[in-house]
Every structure is written in C-alpha cells, then in structure tokens.
Amino acid sequence: MLSADFLHLEKDVEMVNLNADIFHLDVMDGVLVPNISYGFPVVEAIAKKATKTLDVHLMIVHPEKYVERFAQVGAGMISFHLEASDRDGTDPAGILAQIRSDGVKSGLAINPDIPVERVYPYLKDADFILVMSVFAGFGGQKFIEDTYGRVRAVKAEIARQGLSCRIEVDGGVSPSNASALAQAGAEILVAGSAVFKAENPADVISKMKSDDIA
C-alpha cells in the first residue's frame, strides 16, 4: 500500500479487496531505513475496511515494542528485519515467538546484502521469510536479479528441514518477473508500483495471480 493514493485511500483499499489476497503495509521509522511512512492510525483505518489479511512489514528498530499493538489494530501477518535484531542486540527467535503469541503469522525479513543462510536457524520459528528484492525503505526501486537464486536457496533449506515456512518477495515485483519468482519458490509476491501506478491495477493483479501465488 506504500504506492497507493493516500488522498483516496479507501478507493485503493476496495480495489485490493476485490482483486488481491493480502494487504502489504510498509511501516518505516526513518531509523532502520531512511524513509518514514505511517503507523497505527493508518493500519487501523485500513483494517476497518479490509476484507483480506493485513501483512504488516516492520522496517523499524525494536519491533518487539510494537508487535502487540499492531496485532490489536488488525495485523494478520507481521514481519521484522533481521538487521533490526542485529542493531538492537535482540533474539529474532524470541520476537517471532512473540508475534505468534499474539495470534499473528510471524515473518523474518532480510535485505539483499544479508546472506540468506542467516535466516536458516529461524525457519522453524517463522511462518514466512520475506526476501527483499530491493533495499528496504523506498518504493519504486529496480528488481535485483539475484533474488531468484536467493529464493531457491531458502526454499531448498525449508524443504531440507521439513518445514512449511512460506517465502514472500517484496520489491520491484511485476508481471514480468512474477512467474519466475513463483517457479523459484516464492508463494507471496508484493507488488506496489506495478499495481498502483498501472492504468488498470486489477489487470496487473490478475496477470500475477495466474501464476498461482498470493
């Protein structure tokens, strides 16, 4: 929703309700990432109109302080960055458990410069891994091509551990790469600019959903 028209947000919420499966909400604090987006009031307002799951992506420091509140205002999925735990000196497994204890699907996100192997110890604690295909913090960036290999590697490790953890990809996603991402193992694709800047957003979503992904 970062690329939505915030002056006419209800219209875009209804479009997502009718065509997509998940609302992806980017929460940025200007500390972990350079940009600032929105917080509880916007998420809560969207939750009141949304008929699909709210996937809240926390690009913030100390996400453990805010997980419960985001769950209360309507999040059904919450992810946070491994880089936040590195910065804060917190245990990712503990935060993932906290998210689950609030009745929400738990996710761990990594930027393109973080080795994917670093998420392997936490696959059993996470419901999904968010593989960023751009650097977190701004919408409209160009898709990073080595994301395909990173997704394949995480998918193989999930299978090796015998887990059901899903893979989400966010950043520069469009109909031109959706099929290849699905083939690599992605099950949830986040498309912002490709959808909201399109002349026919519903058509773009339909093209990507034809690849059997969320």
Residue ranges and their predicted role:
Residues M1-S79, E83-A93, Q98-S101, S106, ...:
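Conserved N-terminal beta1-alpha1 strand-loop-helix module at the mouth
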Residues D26, N35, S133-A136, I167-E168, ...:
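Short glycine- and Lys/Arg-enriched binding-loop motifs that mark or flank ligand-binding interfaces
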Residues S79, A109, L130-S133, E168, ...:
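Conserved beta-strand segments that form the floor/walls of ligand-binding pockets within enzyme
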Residues K105-A109, D113:
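Internal catalytic-core helix/loop-beta-alpha segment
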Residues D113-P115, S174:
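Short acidic loop-to-helix transition motifs that present clustered carboxylates
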Residues V134, G140-Q141, G162-S164:
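Strongly charged, low-complexity linkers/loops
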Residues G139-I144, D170:
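Short, glycine/charged-rich beta-strand-loop motifs at protein surfaces that mediate ligand recognition
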Residues Q161-V169, S174-A178, A182-A214:
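Alpha/beta catalytic cores of nucleotide-metabolism and tRNA/nucleoside-modifying enzymes
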